[in-house]
Amino acid sequence: HEIRIGSRTNIQDLTMGHVAKGKFGTYIGDDVTIGHSAVIHACTLEDRSFVGMSATVMDGCVIEQGAMLGAGALLAPGKRIPAGELWAGVPARKVRDLTQEEIEFFEVSADRYADLAQEYRVTIPDDLKSE
């Protein structure tokens, strides 16, 4: 299996990504934000989804577009977070529906991190840049 990462996705420090041999790959869509120290294990994160810091997403899980898993949460194997919902806790459960403003922030977050990446790239000496 494989790990695929979409464009403008932000995977923060100490995040770990894995596949489950013979079962599931890890598929991360476009404009996804994954917080520090998250564990992304053989799951699917659809476009513009959000995983909080130190959250764990287990085998076969799906976080749909515009959905959020809160910081420190554990999403048990095979669970699906529907679009527009916030889940949190151990094990993770639905907390509430997200507001439209919160869902729109996911794209703003992706924009900010993409801009930071470009700013950082400008500061790297030319001889160290990859083509």
Residue ranges, per PLM feature:
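Sequence/structural signature of small/polar-enriched beta-strand/turn repeats
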Residues: 2-6, 25-30
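Glycine-rich hexapeptide-repeat left-handed beta-helix
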Residues: 13-20, 24-28, 36-131
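Short proline/glycine- and basic residue-enriched helix-capping loop/turn segments at helix->loop/beta transitions
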Residues: 33
